[in-house]
Design a protein with these regions (language model features):
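Sec-dependent signal peptide recognition
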Residues: 2-10
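Flexible, small-residue-rich N-terminal segments that precede or flank a structured functional core
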Residues: 25-77, 94, 105-109, 163-168, ...
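A short beta-strand element within beta-rich, extracytoplasmic domains
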Residues: 72, 81-95
Length: 181
């Protein structure tokens, strides 16, 4: 008889976390927690005239758009077939308004840790999903189970989060890390 066990794997970069719950067939395996540290975060801002250094800010005001990039290394024994649930867990430190946000697959090799970009690092323009951004500060979870289950033969995963220019001052800040270029 197959017995279910849960392996909670988290990847964290300061206040950002990627949590994967995996299932396996072994009955002698206890529940285990393993931390995987996120290796990089970066910031994109739409205008060169904006010289502000942002802390993973997601903003949709027309002409002043920003997006956050997060990169995670997967463990050597990662197997997408065993994923039961996967969540991107973010710590919202400030927010002006809630709105529709978008999650994209980013090119892990296209951005460096701590950089501020005015030319957006490469990402897949078809969003993985849209979701309503938080309206309050604190922990916020995005279910990325379907995406994580679909990845094959990858050593890392990266995300871009943004809001489309909607003249909506979302001004959503994630975490408290300062990314200086």
């Amino acid at each position: 008889m197959k017995k279910l066990f849960t392996l909670l794997t988290t990847a964290a970069m300061l206040c950002n976390m990627f949590a994967v719950t995996s299932f396996a067939e072994k009955s002698d395996k206890p529940t285990s927690n393993t931390a995987i540290t996120a290796v990089k975060t970066a910031q994109w801002r739409a205008t060169e005239s904006d010289s502000t250094t942002y802390d993973l800010r997601i903003h949709g005001w027309s002409g002043w758009e920003t997006a956050a990039y997060m990169g995670f290394e997967l463990p050597e024994n990662f197997n997408a077939e065993n994923v039961g649930k996967a969540e991107l867990v973010l710590d919202t430190t400030s927010v002006t308004n809630s709105g529709t946000a978008y999650l994209y697959e980013a090119d892990y090799s296209a951005f460096e840790n701590g950089m501020q970009y005015t030319v957006a690092p490469t990402y897949t323009e078809k969003e993985i999903m849209s979701f309503t951004s938080p309206s309050n500060t604190g922990e916020f979870k995005i279910d990325v189970t379907d995406y994580i289950k679909s990845i094959k033969d990858k050593e890392n995963v990266a995300f871009r989060i943004d809001v489309k220019s909607q003249n909506n001052n979302t001004n959503w800040n994630i975490g408290s890390c300062t990314n200086s270029g």
